[in-house]
Amino acid sequence: MLIQAVTIFPEMFDSITRYGVTGRANRQGIWQFEAVNPRKFADNRLGYIDDRPFGGGPGMIMMAPPLHAAIEHAKAQSSQAAKVIYLSPQGKPLTHQKAVELAELPHLILLCGRYEGIDERLLQSSVDEEISIGDFVVSGGELPAMMLMDAVLRLVPGVLGDMQSAEQDSFSSGILDCPHYTKPLEFQGMAVPEVLRSGNHGLIAEWRLEQSLRRTLERRPDLLEKRSLIPKESRILNKILQEQREIQS
């Protein structure tokens, strides 16, 4: 997989290309990265790529021509079709399912905005999709781009040492993950649940599923509304709801 970022701050991506599982996978050649600086495509000696907005208003707007040239340069680096994504609070929310879809693609180009935004004509002519990482504003698209990259890359075969880790993460099954424990057996008066030390894999799997459903019901009930539960999950969830009704009565 080739991922390119159109950014005026290429060095920011060192954290994902050099460190952790994504850095290791990059060194192993499982995925490749290139930062494309649109300043190199500016039509002025000083490398300006922004200007004041028509109609007035605060801040500066990134200009379409240098960004378009940077995107076209990025596309030319691969013979495979590229999907151009603009990281924007106006985009559709990034979900696990979207990350799964993007992990199947051979070439992604991530457009990282700065200042007050990007000329709308560039978005209409050169961007395939806008994606948001949440309903809040950050200073630029670089951090959202790296969050998207991490979410996508961990789903690419070979990036994680054990793909089961990705399969069991929160959201991969549509519900939140269960609690996890390791040594010591007791910490500040809190002991590891007995069932996890029982060696009974059936009971452990049942406990973990129940804890996942409890946590999802408490913290993200909206996820349960979107999910079609299998009979085993419905049975456990009904048990949890019955317990809650008894406590409230």
Curated annotation (Swiss-Prot):
> Keywords for this entry?
Cytoplasm, Methyltransferase, S-adenosyl-L-methionine, Transferase, tRNA processing
Q: What's this protein's name?
A: tRNA (guanine-N(1)-)-methyltransferase
Gene3D superfamilies registered for this protein in UniProt: 3.40.1280.10, tRNA(m1g37)methyltransferase, domain 2
| Gene Ontology CC | cytosol
CDD domains listed in its UniProt record:
TrmD-like
Which InterPro entries does the record associate with it?
Alpha/beta_knot_MTases, tRNA_m1G_MeTrfase_C_sf, tRNA_m1G_MeTrfase_TrmD, tRNA_m1G_MTases_N, tRNA_MeTrfase_TRMD/TRM10
Q: List the disulfide bonds.
A: none
EC number of the protein: 2.1.1.228
**Domain of life, per lineage:** Bacteria
Looking up NCBIfam families in the UniProt record yields:
PRK00026.1 (NF000648), trmD (TIGR00088)
Recorded catalytic activity of this chain's protein? guanosine(37) in tRNA + S-adenosyl-L-methionine = N(1)-methylguanosine(37) in tRNA + S-adenosyl-L-homocysteine + H(+)
Query: What Gene Ontology biological process does one annotation of this record name?
Result: tRNA N1-guanine methylation
* Cited SUPFAM superfamilies: alpha/beta knot (SSF75217)
Q: Where in the cell is it found?
A: Cytoplasm
Is Methyltransferase one of the keywords?
yes
**GO molecular-function annotation terms?**
tRNA (guanine(37)-N1)-methyltransferase activity
UniProt similarity note:
Belongs to the RNA methyltransferase TrmD family.
- Where do the annotations place S-adenosyl-L-methionine binding? 113, 133-138
> How is the subunit organization of this protein annotated in UniProt?
Homodimer.
Native source organism of the sequence: Neisseria meningitidis serogroup C / serotype 2a (strain ATCC 700532 / DSM 15464 / FAM18)
